[in-house]
A protein has these predicted regions:
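N-terminal nucleophile
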Residues: 2-16, 20-121, 125
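Conserved small/polar residues in nucleotide/adenosyl-binding loops
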Residues: 127-133
Length: 133
């Protein structure tokens, strides 16, 4: 990895997350999230969540939980926070946030809001059920 690249976790709706090495540029981050970026710092350690600034307004699909009552819409990136710069995740951070965001989540509508449930990215086949009809 060169000094102009950073190690991140890339999280897309309905897919397992990916560890990636990306150019440490605004353009690269905008391409991954599909638009202007917003940086959130939801945890006490030196980690940022970079998401699409208007993801919910633009109707991007719900992706993963953000806290206990909110969700991130569209693709997002988890990277290190170096103060004024984004930096690579450490091995420990990759381990922690890979566990947190590994599984895709489907959000089911309920009368009380959205209910998140872990899922797999593989399409479900019901052909085995038809054999018993």
């Amino acid at each position: 990895m060169s000094e102009n690249e950073i190690r991140v976790l890339y999280v897309q709706p309905g897919k397992y997350l990916e560890e990636r090495t990306i150019p440490n540029t605004l353009r690269a981050l905008q391409e991954l999230v599909g638009g202007d970026i917003e940086c959130c710092r939801p945890w006490r350690d030196s980690v940022c969540v970079i998401c699409n600034d208007s993801g919910k307004i633009d109707g991007l699909p719900p992706n993963r939980l953000y806290g206990h009552t909110d969700f991130l819409a569209g693709s997002f990136v988890v990277c290190g926070n170096g103060g004024e710069d984004f930096i690579s995740l450490t091995d420990r951070q990759v381990f922690l946030y890979e566990r947190l965001y590994h599984n895709p989540v489907v959000f089911l509508p309920t009368p009380h809001g959205l209910l998140p449930m872990k899922c797999t990215p593989e399409p479900v086949s019901y052909t085995h059920l038809r054999a018993h009809e």
